[in-house]
């Protein structure tokens, strides 16, 4: 018995100490990270849920007026920064409200026990669930047993408000039918849904759009394997590792920070600008390291179809080669919001492609995507499709792969100084006039030389034929080996060295038939040779008539 007295004494001492400790430090008594089915949070109790590492805190809050909200904010940051609001569009109108678990759902009740917000889970109801705030800022509902499945029954990360935290996914979950996007606050003092959204569009290639009233304000460009084609600076974020996933189950973007002790977030502000922040502990303030849209060229379709935006030119809008302003007067006066039209209509079979380098490629919502083929096959595919107006690679890694072809009008492209993507635009062959002139000169020269050779050959053949005919016509008339023309004068036959037939000479001497001469000279017998002269051999002959 004596040995038990000190133990009882220490137990009493511990409980007395714990009682006074909780009385003196009431905040510590409510710093829990879970909410069980038997517990609740009320506005009046000032109770909150704090993540295990003390990074985030969840509780009721108000900014101005009598509207109360349930939200999550950074616990250790001096500037109160909200990252999630549960009942943003259904605030409590007075300081009487409660958060609890009911039928395996998280619910917020007002002073009349009316549900103003709920997780709305349906299906089989678990006997015991618990809500927990994690150190990454995710508020989850899960089974109360630790050995149960790691899959959450519900999580706040699936229902973002205006902020994307590290490890939080933005995009579509096909398996559960979720589309996760951020929506701005209505004002700096009103967390209800504002007019601007930043969400994923999966038609064509997946890419993010900034919307207002369902009108596009800006666009990230599609994922090109390394970054979004309209956010080249992503590769300069050394402290942030980002990932884009596209498969049958989900299409989503997420990021994480390399320094787990630092705080980073992406937030869409009240005027629709998406901003990236990191917390600077020494200055005790948020540092904005990135934002979008950052200039005029980031505004969606600012230059209209068939035109590109370039911040280094004046005006910033430029019609693509082969196109011209629909209203040159408006463009000359500085109004470049009009359209560009083709100078020469396409002919399908003879069209060619003009290469635009370092571009943010057009919106792909109406494009055809084939990731199985390369750039050469993509060009052939575009050529055979007469309505194809441009093509490009879908992935720029390892020299490029995949194919995007645009049908009809395309818009929202811009030119970068470097690191952009190649875009091949279809133009009529006539738009390549300068190149065709050089080519035409070469072809013309080849044809000219060929014609000259053929003509020279024809002339040569004609000349050879004429020479042959001339020789045949001018050949001396003789008998066997003695082919020559004979001239007979007073019974004397002389062989002329040369006399063309057909030449008319004014001869007074009588002409004698050749047969007669042969007979008269006894077949040119040597016995009848009189001698040789300048005109050849001279024969004597005797005619029949004496």
From Swiss-Prot:
Glycosylation sites: 46, 120, 147, 243, 387
Paired cysteines (S-S): 297-309, 303-317, 378-403, 382-388
Annotated Gene Ontology cellular component terms: plasma membrane
Record topology, Extracellular segments: 32-441
Annotated Gene3D superfamilies: Bulb-type lectin domain (2.90.10.10), Phosphorylase Kinase, domain 1 (3.30.200.20)
Annotated ranges, domain Bulb-type lectin: 34-154
Keywords assigned: ATP-binding, Cell membrane, Disulfide bond, Glycoprotein, Lectin, Membrane, Nucleotide-binding, Receptor, Signal, Transmembrane, Transmembrane helix
Signal sequence segment: 1-31
InterPro entries linked to this entry: Bulb-type_lectin_dom, Bulb-type_lectin_dom_sf, Kinase-like_dom_sf, Pan_app, S-locus_recpt_kinase, S_locus_glycoprot_dom
Similarity remark: Belongs to the protein kinase superfamily. Ser/Thr protein kinase family.
Protein function: Truncated and inactivated form of SRK, the female specificity determinant of self-incompatibility when active. Most A.thaliana cultivars contain such an inactive form and thus, are self-fertiles.
Name assigned to this protein: Putative inactive G-type lectin S-receptor-like serine/threonine-protein kinase SRK
Organism: Arabidopsis thaliana (Mouse-ear cress)
Lineage, uppermost ranks: Eukaryota, Viridiplantae, Streptophyta, Embryophyta, Tracheophyta
């Amino acid at each position: 018995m004596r040995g038990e007295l000190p133990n009882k004494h220490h137990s009493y001492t511990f409980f007395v100490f714990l009682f006074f400790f909780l009385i003196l430090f009431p905040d510590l008594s409510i710093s829990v990270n879970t909410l069980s089915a038997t517990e609740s949070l009320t506005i009046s109790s000032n109770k909150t849920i704090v993540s295990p590492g003390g990074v985030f805190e969840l509780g009721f809050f108000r900014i101005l007026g009598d509207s109360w909200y349930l939200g999550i904010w950074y616990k250790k940051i001096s500037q109160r920064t909200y990252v999630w609001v549960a009942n943003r569009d259904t605030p409590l109108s007075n300081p009487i409200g409660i958060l609890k678990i009911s039928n395996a759902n998280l619910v917020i009740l007002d002073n009349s026990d009316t549900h103003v917000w709920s997780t709305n889970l349906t299906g089989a109801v678990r006997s015991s669930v618990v809500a927990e705030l994690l150190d990454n800022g995710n508020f989850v509902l899960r089974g109360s047993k630790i050995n149960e499945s790691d899959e959450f029954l519900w999580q706040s990360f699936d229902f973002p408000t205006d902020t994307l935290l590290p490890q939080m996914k933005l995009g579509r979950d096909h398996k559960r039918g979720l589309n996760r996007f951020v929506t701005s606050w209505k004002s700096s003092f009103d967390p209800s849904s504002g007019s601007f959204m930043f969400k994923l569009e999966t038609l064509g290639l997946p890419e993010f759009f900034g919307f207002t009233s369902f009108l596009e304000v800006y666009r990230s460009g599609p994922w090109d394997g390394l970054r979004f084609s309209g956010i080249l600076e992503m590769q300069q974020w050394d402290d942030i590792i980002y990932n884009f996933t596209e498969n049958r189950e989900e299409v989503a973007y997420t990021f994480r920070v390399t320094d787990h002790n630092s705080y980073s977030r992406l937030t869409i502000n009240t005027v629709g600008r998406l901003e990236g922040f990191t917390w600077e502990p020494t200055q005790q303030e948020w540092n904005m390291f990135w934002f979008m849209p950052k200039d005029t060229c980031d505004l969606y379709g600012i230059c209209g179809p068939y035109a590109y935006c370039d911040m280094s030119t004046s005006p910033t809008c430029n019609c693509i080669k082969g196109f011209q302003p629909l209203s040159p007067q408006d463009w000359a006066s500085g109004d470049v919001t009009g359209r560009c039209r083709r100078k020469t209509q396409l002919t399908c079979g003879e069209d060619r492609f003009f290469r635009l380098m370092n571009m943010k490629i057009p919106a792909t919502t109406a494009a055809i995507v084939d990731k199985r083929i390369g750039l050469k096959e993509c060009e052939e595919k575009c050529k055979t499709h007469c309505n194809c107006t441009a093509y490009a690679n879908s992935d720029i890694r390892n020299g490029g792969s995949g194919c995007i072809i645009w049908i009809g009008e395309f818009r929202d492209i811009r030119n970068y100084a470097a690191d952009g993507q190649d875009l091949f635009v279809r133009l009529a062959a006539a738009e390549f006039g300068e190149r065709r002139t050089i080519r035409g000169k070469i072809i013309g020269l080849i044809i000219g030389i060929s014609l000259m050779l053929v003509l020279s050959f024809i002339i040569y053949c004609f000349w050879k034929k004429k020479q042959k005919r001339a020789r045949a016509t001018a050949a001396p008339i003789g008998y066997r080996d003695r082919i020559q023309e004979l001239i007979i004068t007073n019974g004397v036959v002389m062989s002329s060295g040369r006399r063309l037939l057909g030449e008319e000479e004014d001869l007074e001497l009588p002409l004698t038939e050749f047969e007669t001469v042969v007979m008269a000279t006894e077949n040119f017998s040597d016995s009848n040779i009189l001698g040789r002269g300048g005109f050849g051999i001279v024969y004597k002959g005797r005619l029949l008539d004496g």
